[in-house]
UniProtKB/Swiss-Prot annotation:
Gene name per UniProt: rplA
Transmembrane segments annotated in the record for this chain: none
One Gene Ontology cellular component: cytosolic large ribosomal subunit
Biological source species: Parvibaculum lavamentivorans (strain DS-1 / DSM 13023 / NCIMB 13966)
HAMAP family hit by this protein: Ribosomal_uL1_B (MF_01318_B)
Family of this protein: Belongs to the universal ribosomal protein uL1 family.
Descriptive protein name: Large ribosomal subunit protein uL1
InterPro entries registered for this protein in UniProt: Ribosom_uL1_bac-type, Ribosomal_uL1, Ribosomal_uL1-like, Ribosomal_uL1/biogenesis, Ribosomal_uL1_3-a/b-sand, Ribosomal_uL1_CS
Length: 233
C-alpha cells in the first residue's frame, strides 16, 4: 500500500491540478506516468452541461475509434437462423435465442457487448433487469439492435465504443491503451469528442462541454482545455 502511495505521489509530480493543458501535452503527461506492470487503459472524462434526468438532455451514442480500443471485446448476439450464422461468421463469441436468454437470466454474463436482431427484442426486453444495470441492453440508437448483425459484430470487435452520460452529467470512456502511440490516442480522443458533440441534445443550454480530463487506469487525472481538442485536430 505504501508503495502504491509513493507511486501515485511520484506520478503527480509536474502536474498542476489547477491548470488545464493542451490536448497534446496532456496525452504525453498521462502516457509518461502510466508505469504499472499491466497495459493501462487511457480514460477520458467529459463533464457536460446537461441534466440527464430530463429526457431531452440525455446523451448517448457510439463511436468507432480510428486506432481501435486495445481491448478484447466479447460479443453476445441474440439471433436465429441465417442471422445467427452471420453473427458467428463475423466473430461473435456467443450466439443464441432462448438458450442465451436462460444463460443471461442465471446471471452468467460473460460478454462485454450485446447485440440483437429486431425480432429478438420481445425476448431480450424481458432481460432488462439483468442487462440494463450492466449497460448491456441492446439499443437501436447505438446500433446494437439491427438486422445487420455481422456489421455490428465487426464494429464491436474493431473498436466501437458506446458512451452514455451518467447522473452527474459526466461521460467516461476508454480511448486506448498506454502502449498506444501518442498519435493513436489523440485521434481516438478527437473522434470521441466529435461524436459527443454530434450527440448534443436539443434540451442542452449554455456551455455543452464544460470540462475534459484524461488519465490512465492507475494514474492521476490531467485537465484538458476543451478548445485545444478542436485546435489540435
Amino acid at each position: 500500500m505504501a508503495k502504491a502511495g509513493k507511486r501515485i505521489e511520484k506520478a503527480r509530480e509536474g502536474i498542476d491540478r489547477k491548470k488545464t493543458y493542451g490536448l497534446d501535452e496532456a496525452v504525453k503527461m498521462v502516457k509518461d506516468r502510466a508505469s504499472v506492470k499491466f497495459d493501462e487503459t487511457i480514460e477520458v472524462a467529459i463533464a457536460l452541461g446537461v441534466d440527464p434526468r430530463h429526457a431531452d438532455q440525455m446523451v448517448r451514442g457510439v463511436v468507432a475509434l480510428p486506432s481501435g480500443s486495445g481491448r478484447t471485446v466479447r460479443v453476445a448476439v441474440f439471433a436465429k437462423g441465417d442471422k445467427a450464422d452471420q453473427a458467428r461468421a463475423a466473430g461473435a463469441d456467443i450466439v443464441g435465442d432462448d438458450d442465451l436468454a436462460e444463460i443471461v437470466q442465471s446471471g452468467k454474463i460473460d460478454f462485454d457487448r450485446c447485440i440483437a436482431t429486431p425480432d429478438m427484442m420481445p425476448l431480450v426486453g424481458r432481460l432488462g433487469k439483468v442487462l440494463g444495470p450492466r449497460g448491456l441492453m441492446p439499443n437501436p440508437k447505438v446500433g446494437t439492435v439491427t438486422p445487420d448483425v455481422a456489421e455490428a459484430v465487426k464494429a464491436a470487435k474493431g473498436g466501437a465504443v458506446e458512451f452514455r452520460v451518467e447522473k452527474a452529467g459526466i461521460i467516461h470512456a476508454g480511448v486506448g491503451k498506454a502502449s498506444f502511440s501518442e498519435d493513436q490516442i489523440l485521434v481516438n480522443i478527437r473522434a470521441l469528442i466529435d461524436a459527443v458533440q454530434k450527440a448534443k441534445p436539443t434540451g442542452a443550454k449554455g456551455t455543452y462541454i464544460k470540462r475534459i480530463a484524461i488519465s490512465s487506469t492507475m494514474g492521476p487525472g490531467v485537465k484538458v482545455e476543451p478548445q485545444s481538442v478542436a485546435a489540435s485536430a
